[in-house]
Structures are given as structure tokens and as C-alpha cells.
């Protein structure tokens, strides 16, 4: 319905055994952006990370409301679908959960990286969610990266103090091409930046 706030979603799907980030963006450039994040990762990813570094932010993830930890070694993409569209599969049967983003927002679209997303995106589109592929090269990432930085500098980006997003922002290293275009560099960044991407 039109009474729902408009939202833009961004989905950075990790490899199945790592952190996936879903950004829920509301607002506009003039008045400011509200960003709510939701993260998904498998339980074994947390255990592996804590085995290397007990003091890492991973020690607090299970206690955060905006983190879904799925059992086992791989992220269950069914949980991502359930949060976005409400649809999910149990024992081969599609179920519906009313507590989902499509019920709360008019979702303009889900921008996603084409890598490793085919089945989930096909399912979301089948659920009636518009999904738009989004490249992670300089041509696609430079303008939004500059706008993101501008929103931060002008205090028009509000994330409610999300500790995971704050940590990821601190990890970002930008790469610049000869034309002055910029983009986050996952390879050179100190740690996870999925929520920023």
C-alpha cells in the first residue's frame, strides 16, 4: 500500500560460508538516508573466526537483533528470502511469514551483485520483488561511493549506531582509477566491508 515508506535494498551475498549483508535504505539525498542493516552468516563462520581472534566483533554477533546466524557451515539463503519477501521453503513447501520487509516497505528494488545470486534472485523475483543486478566495478561504484562519503560528511547518513556497520566502515580502503573514480577495495581493506558495499 502507498502508506508504507519507500525503501531501496542492497544485497551483498557472500560466499555461502561467510557474512552476507542486506541494507535497507529509506529517505533521500536532500533530507538524509536512514540505513538499517541485516547480516546473515553461518554458525561455523563465527566459530572459525573466534578460534583466530576471541576479541573480534564476531563474539557479539549472536546477541545483535540485526544478525541472523544459520546453523551449520553455509548461510541458508532461505532466511534471506524470508526476511525480504516473507516466502520460504520448509520440507519442499513454500510458506509465508508476515513479518517481512515487503509488508513494512514499498520496496523499490533489490540491488545485488550477480555473483552467486542466481537461485535467490530467481526466487525473490518469483515472489514479486524487483531485483536489479549491480556491478562492483568503477563504472557502477564510483558515483554511489562518492555520494555515500558526502552523506557521511554532511551528517545525512543515519545508521542508528550499528556496531557492525561502524566496524565495517572503519575497515574500508578505497581504490582509485586513473580517471579519479573510486570504489571500496575488498582485497585491500583490513577486514569485512560487506555492509558498506
What are these regions (language model features)?
Residues 145-154:
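Short, surface-exposed amphipathic charged segments that create phosphate/polyanion-binding patches used
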Residues 1-136, 142, 146, 159-197:
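RNase H-like, metal-dependent nuclease domains and their acidic two-metal-ion catalytic environment used
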Amino acid at each position: 500500500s502507498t502508506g508504507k515508506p519507500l525503501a531501496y535494498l542492497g544485497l551483498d551475498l557472500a560466499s555461502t560460508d561467510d557474512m552476507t549483508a542486506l541494507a535497507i535504505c529509506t529517505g533521500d539525498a536532500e533530507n538524509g538516508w536512514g540505513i538499517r542493516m541485516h547480516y546473515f552468516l553461518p554458525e561455523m563462520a563465527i566459530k572459525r573466526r573466534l578460534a583466530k581472534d576471541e576479541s573480534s566483533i564476531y563474539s557479539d554477533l549472536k546477541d545483535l537483533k540485526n544478525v541472523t546466524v544459520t546453523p551449520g557451515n553455509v548461510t541458508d539463503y532461505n532466511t534471506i528470502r524470508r526476511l525480504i519477501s516473507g516466502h520460504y521453503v520448509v520440507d519442499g513447501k513454500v510458506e509465508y511469514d508476515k513479518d517481512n520487509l515487503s509488508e513494512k516497505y514499498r520496496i523499490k528494488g533489490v540491488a545485488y551483485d550477480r555473483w552467486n545470486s542466481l537461485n535467490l534472485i530467481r526466487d525473490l523475483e518469483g515472489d514479486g520483488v524487483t531485483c536489479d543486478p549491480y556491478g562492483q566495478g568503477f563504472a557502477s561504484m564510483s558515483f554511489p561511493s562518492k555520494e555515500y562519503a558526502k552523506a557521511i560528511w554532511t551528517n545525512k547518513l543515519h545508521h542508528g549506531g550499528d556496531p557492525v556497520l561502524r566496524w565495517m566502515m572503519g575497515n574500508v580502503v578505497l581504490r582509485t582509477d586513473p580517471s579519479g573514480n573510486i570504489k571500496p577495495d575488498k582485497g585491500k581493506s583490513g577486514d569485512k566491508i560487506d555492509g558498506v558495499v
